[in-house]
């Protein structure tokens, strides 16, 4: 940038560098998606086309930022987990959040025709935020929270929409019918009224989607404390629909904690 007498205005910029040695999670959420889904006549309770589109957009973000180790998404939200040691953009919050959010949104629009056979009728938008977590326990608890939220919402929505689509209920009647019910009761409603065993519903609906960056280089061993630059370049992105809450997710993938350092 050329120097001039007007350069003094830079002093009014706010310093927003995120704390060092913390895990950065950038979460994006659909803005006004209830109206957006209604306008595009999304299937209820889940529209697999949109979930696949969200996953495709998340993959674009993961491919662009190699310091993102893991991402978790369900419905109209996605959380991107960064390596604790990342120094991208000098950890400036505004830069990181705006780049992730804008790239995700543009990837969503760009890939729309690959997943929907109708034109885009209105502009999708997403907001974003950055949250810092001090250690692996809290970071894992954050991911557990998002996945539990996915399960609770999906069980409710599945039961709610079956009552409307197949049970002849109105929205208000379905809400009143489900008021105060617990998970076991919703399972029973689905099975007794509609012959649906919720346990056999697609995992992507119940558990959400997890993108991970994983090595294909068999020379890396669990006792290794870091990956070489060459090994990182060989890594591939894989999508999973499994439980994040079980310890097995982490113990069977020890490379994740190494990458997150």
Swiss-Prot record:
Catalytic activity, EC: 2.7.7.79
Catalyzed chemical reaction(s): a 5'-end ribonucleotide-tRNA(His) + GTP + ATP + H2O = a 5'-end phospho-guanosine-ribonucleotide-tRNA(His) + AMP + 2 diphosphate + H(+)
Binding site for Mg(2+) 1: 29-30, 76
Keyword tRNA processing: yes
Keyword 4Fe-4S: no
Taxonomic lineage of the native organism: Eukaryota, Fungi, Dikarya, Ascomycota, Taphrinomycotina
Cofactors, names only: Mg(2+)
PANTHER family given in the database record: TRNA(HIS) GUANYLYLTRANSFERASE-RELATED
GO BP: any one term: tRNA processing
Cofactor: how bound: Binds 2 magnesium ions per subunit.
Binding site for Mg(2+) 2: 29, 76
GO CC annotations, alphabetized: cytosol; nucleus
Key words of the record: GTP-binding, Magnesium, Metal-binding, Nucleotide-binding, Nucleotidyltransferase, Transferase, tRNA processing
Protein name, UniProt field: tRNA(His) guanylyltransferase
Pfam families: Thg1 (PF04446), Thg1C (PF14413)
Taxonomy, superkingdom: Eukaryota
Molecular functions per Gene Ontology: GTP binding; magnesium ion binding; tRNA guanylyltransferase activity
Family: Belongs to the tRNA(His) guanylyltransferase family.
């Amino acid at each position: 940038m050329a120097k001039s007498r007007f350069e003094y205005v830079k002093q009014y910029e706010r310093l927003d560098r995120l704390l060092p040695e913390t895990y950065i999670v950038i979460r994006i959420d659909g803005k006004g998606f209830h109206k957006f889904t209604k306008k595009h006549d999304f299937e209820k309770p889940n529209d697999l086309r949109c979930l696949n589109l969200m996953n495709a957009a998340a993959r674009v973000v993961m491919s662009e930022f190699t310091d993102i180790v893991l991402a978790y998404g369900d419905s109209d939200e996605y959380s991107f987990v960064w390596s604790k040691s990342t120094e991208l953009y000098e950890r400036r919050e505004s830069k990181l959040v705006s780049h992730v959010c804008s790239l995700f949104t543009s990837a969503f629009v760009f890939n729309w025709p690959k997943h929907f056979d109708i034109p885009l009728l209105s502009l999708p938008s997403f907001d974003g935020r950055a949250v810092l977590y001090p250690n692996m326990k809290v970071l894992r608890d954050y991911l557990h929270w998002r996945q539990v939220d996915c399960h609770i919402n999906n069980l409710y929505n599945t039961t709610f929409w079956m009552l409307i689509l197949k049970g002849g209920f109105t929205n208000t009647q379905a809400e009143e019918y489900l008021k105060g019910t617990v998970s076991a009761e919703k399972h029973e409603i689905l099975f007794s009224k509609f012959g649906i065993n919720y346990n056999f519903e697609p995992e992507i609906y119940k558990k959400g989607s997890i993108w991970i960056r994983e090595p294909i280089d068999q020379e890396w061993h669990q006792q290794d404390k870091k990956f070489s630059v060459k090994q990182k370049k060989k890594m591939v992105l894989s999508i999973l629909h499994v439980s994040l809450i079980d310890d097995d997710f982490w113990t069977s993938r020890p490379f994740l904690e190494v990458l997150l350092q």
